[in-house]
Amino acid sequence: MDAFKLLTRATKLKTGATPSSAQSSTRLPSTGKAENPQLFRNSEAEKVLEQAQQGKKRKRTAAAEARDADDDAAELNFFGARKAAVSSTPTSKEEKQEQERSGEDDASDEEVEFMDEVQRRTVLNAHKIKVTDLRDLEEIQPVRVASEEPKKKKKKRKQQEEEESKVPLTKKEQKKARRLYPEPLVSFKELRSKYKISSRLAENIAEQGFTVPTEVQLGTLPLLLGGFESKAGESVEPDLLVVAPTGSGKTLSFLIPVINKIVRHHHDQSQEQERGIFSIIVAPTKELASQIVNEGRKLVHGTGVKIALMKKGMRVVEREDEDDDGDDSSSEDGDESSESEHEERPIAKKSKGKAPVTKSDILVTTPLQLVNALSTNQTKPMATLPLVRNIVLDEADVLLDPLFRDQTLNIWRACTHPELRASLWSATMGSNVEDLAKSTIKERKEAVNQTKSYPLLRLVVGLKDSAIPNIEHKLIYAATEQGKLLGLRQLLHPTAASASDVRLRPPFLIFTQTIPRAVALHSELRYDIPTEAGGSSRIAVLHSDLSDGQRSEIMKNFRKGEIWILVTTDLLARGVDFRGINGVVNYDIPNSAAVYVHRVGRTGRAGREGGIAVTYYTKEDIPYVKSIANIIDVSEKLRGKTGEKSIQKWLLDALPDLSKKDKKELKKHGVKARQSNLKSDKDDKEHRKTRISTKSGFERRIENKKKALIAANRNRKSQAQSAADGDSGNESWDGLEN
C-alpha cells in the first residue's frame, strides 16, 4: 500500500506527482548520455531523414529477416533468461560464414540513394550547418558552369570571356556561389553502406554505441570520406576548416576518415613497402593528446592500424646526419644532449645501433615535442616527413596563435607529401586563422609543385564563436574577492533558499587565472567537504607546474569519481572531455570570449542537458565583462529561452566596451590586479585586495614572523657550521704533547 496515495486521496494532486519524482525529473549531465546528441533539429529535417532511411531499404532474404527478428527479440527482452541471448548467436561455422557473407552483401548490394538538393538544403539548414568554399572565385566559377550548364560548352571562348567580364558578381552572388550543400550523413550505418569504410572500423563504431551523428559528424564525415566531387567529377578529399560547438564529437569526426584511409592504404600497398607515420594529429596540451589516443585505440582495435602518443626519446624519422654525430658522441661530453639522447645511449652500446624509428601509422603529439624530435632539440635543421598524408590540428586557433604558431607551421612544412590533406578543428576560429591556413596551403602548393587542385572548405555549426545552447549561464556580481569566496562556499554548502538561487552538484571544475591563485584557492577549500564525505581527498588542484605523473593521476581519479571538485587553470579549458561534469565555475573571469566558450564547454557534452556555468566578477572585472555577457545573451537566444533572461538589456547597455589594445593586453596577461609579477607599491596594494584568503592581517603577521624566525635560525646554524668547518680546516697538526 502506498502511504502517500492514501494520505492525499482527497487532494487534487496527480498520480505519480511525488516529491521524489519531481526531483528526479531534473536531468543532469552526470545522470547519463542524452537520447539525441544533436543540438539543433526540427520536425522538417527529421521527416526528410526518415524518408531517406526508408528509401534505402531493400528486400531481404527470409533467413536474414528471421535473424534480425531474433536479434530484436534478444535486445528487447531485458528481463529474459540468459539462454535467449546465447541461442541467438550462431553456433556452427556454416552459420558464422553465412552471417559474414550476408554482412558483406548488406554493404555491397544495398541500393544507395542520394538526396536531392532540396532535401540536402532542408537538413543542413535545420541543423544550422553552413558549408562554404574558401577558394578564389576564379577557381569556383568554372566548376559551377561545368556542373550546372553542360550545354554551354559549345560556345566560343571569346563569348564566354565577354559574358564573364561584363557582369561582375555582387557580394550576395559571391556568397551564393561559395555556398555548398553536400550530402549529409543520416546514420552511422551509412558509413559502411554508402562510403564503404572498413567493416572492422564500422563494428568498432557500433560497439562504442554511436547511432545518431551529431551536427559536425553529419556534415564533415561525408566530405572527408570522399563525398565531395571535384571539377573532373571525381570524389576528392578537401582541406577542411571546422568550427563546431564544444562536446559535439569533433574527435570522432577526424579519427574515422584518418583510420579508414590508412586501412585502405595498407590493403592497397605491397607487403614489402616500409610502414611509417601516415597521419599526424597535433594538440596543444598533453591531456588532450592522451585523450585522443585513448579514443583512437577503441576505433583501431582489430584494424591493423597503430596509434601512438609522442613521448620523450621517441624517434620519428631516420636522419642521415645522425650517423656522423653518433661516431663523435663517444669522445665528446654528453652534457648538451637531450633526455632522448640519454635514453638512447645505453641501447646503442648494447645493440650497436640507435633506438628504432616508430612504426605507428598515427602519431598524436604536442607541437614542441615533435619539433624537438625532428630537429634534435632544435640543434639541427628540421627533418622531413615524406609519408605523412594527413595533418590534423585540434584546437587550431591556439596552435596558430603566436605561442605555438612557429612550431605548428614548422611541422606543417615538414610534411612534404604532394597529396597532404590538412584539417583544422576548433569551437572558435577567427578570420586571421583562416587567412593563415589559406596562405600556408598556397605556399605548400607552390613549394611542392602540386599540379592537382584540392578544394578548401569551411564548415560552421550553429553561430560562429558562440557557447553551446544546452547549458544555463549565470553571471554573478560578487564585488570583492571575499564575496567570490563566499559565493563559492554557498555552492558547496547550499541552504534552503529561494528557487532562483544557483544549485550546483559535484562533480564540477573551478577555473582561475594563474597557478598561484589555483593553489591558494585549493588550500582554502580543501577542508570544506566533511570527513564523512571524503574530506580533503575530494578536492584537488591541477596545473602545468605539476609533473606528468601527478597530472595523469589527478585526471584518472577525477574520471573515476574519487575527486569531486577540481581547481585548475586554462590547462583544462580546451578539448578535454569530461562527460559527467555538472557545471563549471569561473572563479576568475576568462581572458577572452573564446576562452569563456571553451571553459563552459566542459559541461553539456554530447547534448547533455542540465549543465550550469557560473561566472563571478568583481569591481576590477567590470571593464572586461561585456564580451562574456554578449556570449551569454546570444546563447540564450539560440536556445530559444522564454521568460526572464539572465542578462538584462540594461546590463548590456551599462557595461563599457573594451578597446582592441585592452583586449590584447587582457588576452596576454589577464586582469592586471591578479597578475603574480606585480612590482610597484600601488600594484601591490591592488594585489592584496585580490588575495584568496579568509585569514585576518593579524594572523598572517604572526605566521610571517614565525617563518622569519625559522629562516633566521636555519641561517645562523648553517653559518656556525660553515665557520666550524673553516676553523678545523685551517688548523695544522703539531704532534703529540709531552
From Swiss-Prot:
Transmembrane segments: none
Chain span(s) of sequence motif Q motif: 190-218
Top-level taxon: Eukaryota
Name of protein: ATP-dependent RNA helicase rok1
Subcellular location: Nucleus, Nucleolus
Biased composition (Polar residues): 17-29
A single MF term (Gene Ontology): RNA helicase activity
Enzyme Commission number: 3.6.4.13
Domain Helicase ATP-binding: 231-447
Entry's family note: Belongs to the DEAD box helicase family. DDX52/ROK1 subfamily.
One cellular component term from this protein's GO annotations in UniProt: nucleolus
PROSITE patterns cross-referenced by the UniProt entry: HELICASE_ATP_BIND_1, HELICASE_CTER, Q_MOTIF
Compositional bias annotation for Acidic residues: 319-338
Catalytic activity as recorded in UniProt: ATP + H2O = ADP + phosphate + H(+)
Chain segments carrying region Disordered: 1-112, 145-176, 316-356, 663-738
GO biological process terms, semicolon-separated: maturation of SSU-rRNA
Subunit structure: Interacts with the U3 snoRNA and is associated with the 90S and 40S pre-ribosomes.
Physiological role: ATP-dependent RNA helicase involved in 40S ribosomal subunit biogenesis. Required for the processing and cleavage of 35S pre-rRNA at sites A0, A1, and A2, leading to mature 18S rRNA.
Keywords from the UniProt entry: ATP-binding, Helicase, Hydrolase, Nucleotide-binding, Nucleus, Ribosome biogenesis, RNA-binding, rRNA processing
Motif DEAD box mapped to chain: 394-397
Comp. bias regions, Basic and acidic residues: 92-104, 697-706
Domain notes: The Q motif is unique to and characteristic of the DEAD box family of RNA helicases and controls ATP binding and hydrolysis.
Positions that bind ATP: A244, P245, T246, G247, S248, G249, K250, T251
Residue ranges occupied by any Helicase C-terminal domain in the UniProt entry: 487-655
Species of origin: Aspergillus clavatus (strain ATCC 1007 / CBS 513.65 / DSM 816 / NCTC 3887 / NRRL 1 / QM 1276 / 107)
Pfam families given in the database record: DEAD (PF00270), Helicase_C (PF00271)
